[in-house]
Design a protein with these regions (language model features):
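Bacterial N-terminal signal peptides
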Residues: 7-16
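A conserved helix-loop-strand patch within extracytoplasmic ligand-binding domains
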Residues: 108-154
């Protein structure tokens, strides 16, 4: 009887442990790069992995993996919105009001607003024109190339810039090369890598030397609006806040900023600060230095804010 009771007890203990052992890791499937030279999202997926690792003891194992086929942003958002039927379940994008209605946002600025500091790729004759410009109104005489689905397309339009729209990221580089528009607005975090990747394909392509546009444009993680998405969002936010509390988030951000801005000289540029009409009240207060970077050291001392 004692042996039978002991066997029964062991059996119960083993059965109780099985669900935890057999539980499937939480999967995070994101879009792959648009091409082999596209490194724009590497930092964000590394931050995601660090956040998930930070609370592994609380939430269990996880898998972070790219989907096998590239997709543009419109398709990626639709796939996440499809929930269980979607081929991916997480994207990292600059937020806007419409996107926050469709998807579940985790409202923590992953790059502390760095994406909202914008510079231009231009052709030589455009730089010559810009050398003689001083005001925002003069800058607005030129056309800016944008993808129709990008968040800052609405921001720039609301600030009365002239836009030339396209649906293809690579196509915008080609259009600039044949002078279909004047300015290709790119984040300070991405412009140098993009210039390196395209300068040999587009003779004369250069990074504009004089101006910066700035507006608060945080990049968030987005997941489906369903039960699984809520579990994902809870875990991601918990992990990001753990990273912030430990100082790991700031360490990673500073290393990332140093890397992406290493070959750019921001000091001495004229900064035009614009309003972001697409920023919801979910965003952290703009004076919260934990989640926003004003780039004061990089823009000082010779920077003069445009009026």
């Amino acid at each position: 009887m004692k042996v039978s009771a002991l066997c029964l007890l062991l059996s119960c203990l083993l059965n109780a442990a099985l669900p935890a052992q057999a539980a499937e890791p939480m999967s995070f499937i994101h879009p792959p790069p648009e091409n082999t030279s596209d490194k724009r999202h590497t930092y964000y997926w590394e931050i995601l992995e660090a956040a998930l690792q930070s609370n592994r003891s609380k939430y269990g194992d996880y898998k972070v993996m790219p989907y096998g086929t590239p997709m543009n942003f419109q398709r990626a958002a639709a796939e996440v919105e499809a929930g269980e039927k979607g081929r991916i379940n997480i994207v990292s994008r600059a937020t806007n009001l419409e996107l926050e209605e469709r998807l579940r946002a985790i409202p923590i600025p992953l790059d502390k607003g760095l994406l909202g500091y914008r510079m231009f790729l231009v052709m030589p004759e455009t730089q010559a024109r810009l050398d003689n410009m001083q005001t925002l109104e003069e800058l607005k005489q030129l056309t800016i190339g944008q993808a129709s689905v990008w968040t800052d397309t609405k921001i720039l339009g609301d600030n009365n810039f002239k836009l030339v729209l396209a649906d293809n990221y690579e196509g915008l580089f080609q259009m600039l090369g044949v002078r279909r528009y004047d300015l290709f607005s790119r984040g300070a975090i991405e412009i140098h890598a993009e210039w390196l990747a395209h300068k040999n394909k587009i003779p004369g392509l250069t990074i504009e030397k004089k101006f910066v546009l700035a507006y608060p444009m945080p990049r968030y993680f987005f997941v489906p609006r369903n039960k699984d998405g809520e579990r994902m969002a809870e875990r991601i936010e918990d992990g990001l806040r753990r990273l912030a509390k430990s100082g790991e988030f700031e360490r990673r951000y500073q290393a990332y900023k140093k890397l992406v801005l290493a070959d750019l000289d921001l000091s001495g540029r004229k900064v035009f600060r614009l309003t972001n009409t697409q920023l919801s009240d979910k965003a952290p207060p703009l004076n919260d230095k934990l989640w926003w970077d004003d780039l004061a050291p990089e823009l000082a001392p010779s920077n003069r804010t445009g009026r």
